[in-house]
């Protein structure tokens, strides 16, 4: 599952860089619509990447201390945990 998330992140990042290069191209410096479109696209993708970060890293990768899991050894502590994925 982590592989697919990293793959999706890489594809979206490459598409974002391609879109940034296309919209910031100096062929038409007088085109204000191109700059507005670029800013809207960057705003959309930045919020989308932040959303992906919060969903994956802050929700699905938590280790909860629950009944019925495996042992994780810490210095002087032993937790009985299970790893949950919500995505």
From Swiss-Prot:
Main localization of the protein described in the UniProt heading: mitochondrion
Protein's recorded name: Small ribosomal subunit protein uS12m
Family the UniProt entry places it in: Belongs to the universal ribosomal protein uS12 family.
InterPro entries: Ribosomal_uS12m
Compartment(s): Mitochondrion matrix, Kinetoplast
Function as written in the Swiss-Prot or TrEMBL entry: Protein S12 is involved in the translation initiation step.
Alphabetized Pfam families for the sequence: Ribosomal_S12 (PF17487)
Keyword Ribosomal protein: yes
Gene Ontology, cellular component aspect: kinetoplast; ribonucleoprotein complex; ribosome
Keywords of the record: Kinetoplast, Mitochondrion, Ribonucleoprotein, Ribosomal protein
Keyword Protease found: no
Organism expressing this protein natively: Trypanoplasma borreli
């Amino acid at each position: 599952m982590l592989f697919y998330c990293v793959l999706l992140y890489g594809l979206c990042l490459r598409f974002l860089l391609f879109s940034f290069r296309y919209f910031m191209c100096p062929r038409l410096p007088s085109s204000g619509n191109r700059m507005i479109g670029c800013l809207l696209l960057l705003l959309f993708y930045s919020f989308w990447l932040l959303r992906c970060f919060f969903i994956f890293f802050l929700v699905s990768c938590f280790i909860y201390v629950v009944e019925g899991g495996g042992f994780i050894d810490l210095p002087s502590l032993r937790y009985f945990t299970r790893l949950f994925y919500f995505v």
